From Swiss-Prot:
Function text: Catalyzes an amino-pyrimidine hydrolysis reaction at the C5' of the pyrimidine moiety of thiamine compounds, a reaction that is part of a thiamine salvage pathway. Thus, catalyzes the conversion of 4-amino-5-aminomethyl-2-methylpyrimidine to 4-amino-5-hydroxymethyl-2-methylpyrimidine (HMP). To a lesser extent, is also able to catalyze the hydrolytic cleavage of thiamine; however, this thiaminase activity is unlikely to be physiologically relevant.
Catalytic reaction annotation: 4-amino-5-aminomethyl-2-methylpyrimidine + H2O = 4-amino-5-hydroxymethyl-2-methylpyrimidine + NH4(+); thiamine + H2O = 5-(2-hydroxyethyl)-4-methylthiazole + 4-amino-5-hydroxymethyl-2-methylpyrimidine + H(+)
EC number in record: 3.5.99.2
Name by which UniProt lists this protein: Aminopyrimidine aminohydrolase
Family membership noted in the UniProt record: Belongs to the TenA family.
Gene for this chain: tenA
Annotated metabolic or biological route of this protein: Cofactor biosynthesis; thiamine diphosphate biosynthesis
CDD domains in the record: TenA_C_BhTenA-like
Keyword Hydrolase found: yes
Subunit structure: Homotetramer.
InterPro entries: Haem_Oase-like_multi-hlx, TenA_E, Thiaminase-2/PQQC, Thiaminase_II, Thiamine_Salvage_TenA
Residues the record marks as active site: C135, E207
GO cellular component: cytosol
Amino acid sequence: MSFAASLYEKAQPIWEAGYNHPFVQGIGDGSLEKSKFQFFMKQDYLYLIDYARLFALGTLKGNDLQTMSTFSKLLHATLNVEMDLHRAYAKRLGISAEELEAIEPAATTLAYTSYMLNVAQRGSLLDLIAAVLPCTWSYYEIGVKLKGIPGASDHPFYGEWIKLYASDEFKELADWLIQMLDEEAKGLSSKEKAKLETIFLTTSRLENEFWDMAYNERMWNYNG
């Protein structure tokens, strides 16, 4: 079993909980309230800005031209594919470009992005990959599962979201990261692998916190 496959196996209970979250299920059956999705898209827009920064940092940390090129492609896809989807949904939801740029991060968004940036800046290229991979990989899995629900990808509002994350193009992004992880992890000690596992499982859990934040439209638990 490859190292990435072993991480995938250990993360399955977390990812299953994410897929079964009422936010995700609401996208699948079309019942999710628009206000919850709007909250999600605003916070996810902020998230993607920092996610793009992580890919830019990956380009800097790359040890060879191929790695640098791969992270450059991931950066481009985030800025010009995922964020375009968010801007298109924002327009449909009546959110102006100015409003998008002025969004304040919720506590969960801040915790999630700060954790990844801290790991990536202080750690190695492998640490960075372990931090960003759960988002891309689990989103593709969710997209494929939701696409398997009859009529889900044809939904007039949520269908485009499902189709993007279930696409072959998005799978390619996840595959690049998986392949890099396995290649870079060759020869690591058990201790080094355990560190990467902790990072991978932590960001997997933070993904679920993000779904829950959006479903409850929660900025902060305490606003005093």
